Amino acid sequence: MDTVIELSKLLHDEEFKDNASCTSTPTLKTARIIESAVTGITLTASVPMIIIVITTMILYHRVAKHNATSFYVITLFASDFVLMWCVFFMTVNREQLFSFNRFFCQLVYFIYHAVCSYSISMLAIIATIRYKTLHRRKQTESKTYSTGRNIGILLLASSMCAIPTALFVQINGAKKTTGKCVVYLSSPKAYELFLAVKIVFSFIW
């Protein structure tokens, strides 16, 4: 119960102190500008390419419906596409080009961490399928009945892993309603959070 009360205090900004007046060194500012520029160039080049790849994979999946891997690849590139938009929103917010409210910040961070977990897990699944196919050439990929179930389970697990980050998103700015999105996690809360994750993984294992 004490943990729930402390968590509710944190979620209502009772422990978070605004740090909008904190100054940055010239080196740090330069590094952030370079990072934002590289991110912008990467997004500009990657988004059209991913759209082309997704369109091509959808057309291929319509022709080769027996191939379950193609549907996994489509969802993988779709998650990467969503991830890039999350990176775009996080970058423009960090550079203070746009100010977001707390709900939008939580939504962006939740989707960002969820699709990151999903992409990494989906890569592992695709690699496993390709490995099994190469070593069992007589086995076909016609069993697509479990594809939707596997994707649904993976999305649910990724969303559950992204919930803690979204809960600790705060607003850092002169205004209390909008500003820069930050993830504030005090040391005691971090210890309790990772302890809970450790217990959950121990039960699962």
UniProtKB/Swiss-Prot annotation:
UniProt-listed SUPFAM superfamilies:
Family A G protein-coupled receptor-like
| Source superkingdom | Viruses
Tell me the compartments it is located in. Answer: Host membrane
Disulfide bonds, paired cysteine numbers: C105-C181
Spell out the protein name for this chain.
G-protein coupled receptor
Instruction: State the taxonomy lineage.
Output: Viruses, Duplodnaviria, Heunggongvirae, Peploviricota, Herviviricetes
* Topology within the bilayer: Multi-pass membrane protein
Which gene does this sequence derive from?
Answer: U12
Can you supply one Gene Ontology CC term for this chain's record?
membrane
Main subcellular localisation = host cell
